[in-house]
Amino acid sequence: MERKNLHFETLQVHVGQEQADPATDARAVPIYQTTSYVFHNSAHAAARFGLQDPGNIYGRLTNSTQGVFEERVAVLEGGIAGLAVASGAAAITYAFENITRAGDHIVAAKTIYGGSYNLLAHTLPNYGVTTTFVDPSDLSYFEKAIQENTKAVFIETLGNPNSNIIDIEAVSEIAHRHKIPLIIDNTFGTPYLIRPIEHGADIVVHSATKFIGGHGSSLGGVIVDSGNFDWVASGKFPQLTEPDPSYHGVRFVDAAGPAAYVTRIRATLLRDTGATISPFNAFILLQGLETLSLRVERHVENALKVVNFLNNHPKVKKVNHPSLSDHPDHALYQRYFPNGAGSIFTFEVKGGQEEAHRFIDSLEIFSLLANVADVKSLVIHPASTTHSQLNAQELAEQEIYPGTVRLSIGTEHINDLIADLEQALAKI
């Protein structure tokens, strides 16, 4: 059967290995634990290095286990090509480094993961790339922030940690009007709940460590190229459209066509900086991917019940979740997430940091750690951990207060989760 006729739940299990492994007849994707690959002859080796033959060259660049994982995520996102790397942080870093140089500029929503914020606000400026952060609730701010040297707009489908939602299609129109790509982090959304490319995204990135892996056991990141952005017509990206002196004069738009973006990352950035995913991690993440839809359905089901419980609790000051009718992004939630979303969100306890810490320390089922999107329910205090690098003004702008608690709702029985939350709230 053709892939276009298959549903998500089938694709997440089969893409990349529709038949048994031809060498061993293994039905599971094998772990190809090797550093390098034998070329048939000298001409074959030259063709591989010249990008005329798309096969394996060296383990830092490609691996057959990794290749299945990349293809599967790309298909699930509706893209034409994918690249798996060592972590979500590496994926986001490469996504920007691939199309920026010293003197360039990025526009980003300010309601993003603290690690991404630090990358854009502090690390990339060391290399001459600056970022303007905007309030995504007013789309005019995106338009006003774009400059002649702006090379990308960056947002998340669901903001971290508050699960705010941005009008993707409207931001895409703004970016494309200025001939620059829209890069979206879909880690919290997952391709099961939303496919940003269908709403105008050009590049999608994931921390595969989260929902894709789903079990808190392996690090990984993925970059998916939609193949839709016209790098030549834009005229702003010589890295892709002009001969690359570091790769014997290749023009990536000629060598890779619509997959030029991810091909350049693999051929140059991954080659030179080596944030390579291990074959074993790619295998583990593939195992997680096969049950993505099943887990996400349970995550969302549990989360909505927890939101309702917290929203009616006398010791809770505020719940930040777009499913609530009074949430400012509720209409966007209904539009972009008809099947629900937001199993990672924040709420604010009455009092402050002392009460928040006492609540967290009293939980028994929820684990206090920095990860999210695990089958196990998780909790953390953002202001003193994940977002602690932000100053007081930056925290307030992201609506992270001393009493703010982030929850990542797992797949346990809902009655047990609510009972745990209830006993912990009773202690503050």
Question: Where are the predicted features?
Answer:
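Conserved N-terminal alpha-helix of the aminotransferase class I/II PLP-enzyme fold
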Residues: 41-93, 115-123
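N-terminal "arm"/small-domain region of PLP-dependent enzymes with the aminotransferase-like
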Residues: 2-63, 71-72
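Short hydrophobic/aromatic beta-strand micro-patches
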Residues: 224, 346-348, 408-410
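PLP-dependent enzyme catalytic core of the Aspartate aminotransferase-like
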Residues: 9, 80, 121, 130, ...
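Conserved PLP-enzyme active-site core in the AAT-like
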Residues: 2-3, 16-20, 83-312
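Active-site beta-loop-alpha junctions enriched in small/polar residues
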Residues: 158, 187-189, 324, 350, ...
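Conserved small-domain helix->loop->beta segment predominantly found in fold-type I
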Residues: 273-276, 280-282, 287, 291, ...
